[in-house]
Amino acid sequence: MKNILEKYAKLLCHYSLELKQGEKLYISTTTLAQPLVREIYREATKIGVHVEVAFSFREQGKILYDNAPDSLLRQEPTFHKLAISEFDAYLNIRAPFNLNETNNIDKAKRKIRTEALTPINNIYFERTADRNAPNGLKRSLCQYPTQANAQAANMSLEEYQQFVFNACHLFSDNPEGEWLKVRAQQQHIKEYMDKVSLVRYKADHTDISFSVEGRTWINSDGQTNMPSGEVFSGPVEDSVNGKVHFTFASIFMGQDVQGITLWVENGEVVKWDAEVGNKVLDEVFKIPGAKFFGEVAIGTNYNIQRTTRNILFDEKIGGSIHMAVGQSYKQTGGKNQSGIHWDMITDMTESGEIYADGTLIYEKGKFLI
């Protein structure tokens, strides 16, 4: 295990975050991820990087929501804001204790907290729009395998560890080399899509189109997410029209939502339905900006072939597409603003098609270009 975590740490420090001597790295995670944090701290320190770690403990979020007055929920987390505003690199390691920890908290309190964090999220999206800009923030999101995620994926912890490490190419003798291959393959797709104006996703119960004219497609190659394997952009906000059905379950703040269908007119979600969790959608679409799309994407990681109820992996499934309501990514040219960014995914391997300016470029989970 130590050997694989050493490889993981080196991949994150050198490839994903491209850390350099004199930089400041902010790590946010739970105490469960301590074994990986130790190796990252070791590797970053060798480079000459100043590291600060924010560990959260079991049920910290629930304790806050259960006990804090509204005035406290409206306060911004001081150090988190400082780090997001001023540090050079940010690594968020997901390592949950319990995926259902905050399921039963008061919805009004959740909304207050979401709105309070919006200004920090805006700083985050602004700084991560271009990691190479003078005030850019290099960021990466990764996973440390825990029992909670293993149970959600219907796997043993050992099986889940194998799944996570395989998705990151950590069993390769040269993980960074594998990700450089991914980068090259996806760059071809990115350059093709950058010349496209109108995109159409078509599958069972789905027929939705949108403009990406003037927008940029991003080659997500394992730097901002580890694992990665997707190309994504931001649709022109008022151009999305049609109906889209998401075949994979989605999780919103610990709540399970299945069989989501959205009807969209001139960019705005005008009707919604879910086989499970429709009330969650009712609450989500009350959030400012949530009725408009911030992202459209295509998953390309064929090392991920099953859902695990974890969006970091599920949205990358080779042969899938996803769309996110809420906040746009600045680097795509997207302009939608919201306190949320929620990805919803559908399988394209059975009957899926993608058209670019009327040309079929993707069929049954595979690119034709």
Feature map (PLM): residue ranges:
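A structural signal for short secondary-structure junctions
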Residues: 238, 253-256, 263-264, 287-291, ...
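Short polybasic amphipathic segments
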Residues: 198-201, 260, 270, 350-360
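Active-site bordering "gate/hinge" segments
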Residues: 1-241
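Intrinsically disordered terminal and processing segments
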Residues: 322-369
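Dual-mode signal for accessory low-complexity, basic/Gly-rich regions
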Residues: 271-335, 354
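Residues in well-ordered beta-strands of folded domains
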Residues: 92, 142, 202, 211, ...
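Oxyanion-binding "anion nests"
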Residues: 227-272
